[in-house]
Amino acid sequence: MRRMRFSPRSSFARTLLLIVTLLFVSLVTTYLVVLNFAILPSLQQFNKVLAYEVRMLMTDKLQLEDGTQLVVPPAFRREIYRELGISLYTNEAAEEAGLRWAQHYEFLSHQMAQQLGGPTEVRVEVNKSSPVVWLKTWLSPNIWVRVPLTEIHQGDFSPLFRYTLAIMLLAIGGAWLFIRIQNRPLVDLEHAALQVGKGIIPPPLREYGASEVRSVTRAFNHMAAGVKQLADDRTLLMAGVSHDLRTPLTRIRLATEMMGEEDGYLAESINKDIEECNAIIEQFIDYLRTGQEMPMEMADLNSVLGEVIAAESGYEREINTALQAGSIQVKMHPLSIKRAVANMVVNAARYGNCWIKVSSGTESHRAWFQVEDDGPGIKPEQRKHLFQPFVRGDSARSTSGTGLGLAIVQRIIDNHNGMLEIGTSERGGLSIRAWLPVPVARVQGTTKEA
């Protein structure tokens, strides 16, 4: 059987737990110190004084310091009873007077027995006003002595409890606020690191907090600046290469237009190659631009899918739809999602047999859209590499393409905090489903097929 262990993972929870534990240990230690060095000695002194009073009340003669004995008159004894509030009860009367609700304390009985020199039973009755001590000694085994502690009130402990609770809450609240302030730079750093992972370079972070955190933030800013410079250099290089490639391609196209009619088939073949080269260059540029920050807005996913379906449908291509009826409002960059859907449809058209199905829906706080084809599919062990740049399945080796179409889709969906799933379509081909986060309150309608 697996053992369950409580182990907080975040530094916030660990630090707060450590402070609360230290505070609890400090309170327990303080309690033990006060108990052993203040309360117990006072209690022993109280027992000693109480024992003197009981001995004086239970005996007829008192021994003074010089050794002489003094006879205690009954009137003097009664006056002491009245001043101290002490009452004497038989066993039956004591039960009726509250002894039945009193609790026996062994350590008090033991200490009182030592003071009185014989067996003694001590009980404490706790009532609403003040506690009462009941004693029965060997000096008068049939009599219970009732001693009210009128100077001690139940309400006296309430301020102590409230002050202790207030101190604990203030300490925990202060610790929580301190840790939150200390961890705020780390939260900003985490958010910025996630953006860099998506290809979005945030502005330099403000360096604040502890010296170690400032050092990490400074190093992260240097790293982000280096990554941004590298991305800018790559984009500039690709733009220059594409410009330099398009110039000779344009000259080649002009040369084909000046070719004679007898070379028309050759000119047509050259023009197709030129168009393919231009398409490859455009895909390279699209891939580089995909990682840039995109402004998000609330848009209808079904409307975006409908625009792509209308643009990609043709007499040689059958696109079936199973879109959820109504509106699916998603926070997105519509142009990027449109590009992702178009790439998925083009991929299905290229490797399928003219059957494509586009569907959409919602499930568990998420919206999804899916593109299926009836092609040969792809082996399960190759699916995890399908969205990597320049990677294509075995069935696509003989077809044209750069292998960047689905890589662009992956980057777009990642920038929307979504995810991609690969499966098998209803006709045995490839199925690609994209999930996007969406509030449940913005989902309406049911699925309808066309």
Swiss-Prot record:
The segment(s) forming the HAMP domain are 180-232
Phosphohistidine: residues bearing it: H243
Q: Which GO terms describe its cellular component?
A: plasma membrane
Whether Cell inner membrane counts among this entry's keywords is yes
Might you give the EC number(s) for this enzyme?
A: 2.7.13.3
Q: Which UniProt keywords apply?
A: ATP-binding, Cell inner membrane, Cell membrane, Kinase, Membrane, Nucleotide-binding, Phosphoprotein, Stress response, Transferase, Transmembrane, Transmembrane helix, Two-component regulatory system
Write down the chemical reaction(s) this protein catalyses: ATP + protein L-histidine = ADP + protein N-phospho-L-histidine
Q: How does it assemble?
A: Homodimer.
Domain free text? Has several major domains; the N-terminal cytoplasmic domain is followed by 2 transmembrane helices that anchor the protein in the membrane; the periplasmic domain between the helices interacts with MrzA. The cytoplasmic C-terminal domain has a HAMP domain joined by a flexible linker to a histidine kinase domain. The HAMP domain by itself is intrinsically disordered. The cytoplasmic dimerization domain (CDD) forms an osmosensitive core and includes the autophosphorylated histidine residue.
Q: What does this protein do?
A: Member of the two-component regulatory system EnvZ/OmpR involved in regulating expression of the outer membrane porins OmpC and OmpF as well as other genes. Unlike E.coli or S.typhimurium both porins are expressed constitutively. Involved in regulation of the biosynthesis of Vi polysaccharide, a capsular antigen thought to be involved in the virulence of S.typhi. Vi antigen is synthesized at low NaCl concentrations (under 0.4 M). EnvZ functions as a membrane-associated protein kinase that phosphorylates OmpR in response to environmental signals.
Name the record gives this protein: Sensor histidine kinase EnvZ
Taxonomic lineage is: Bacteria, Pseudomonadati, Pseudomonadota, Gammaproteobacteria, Enterobacterales
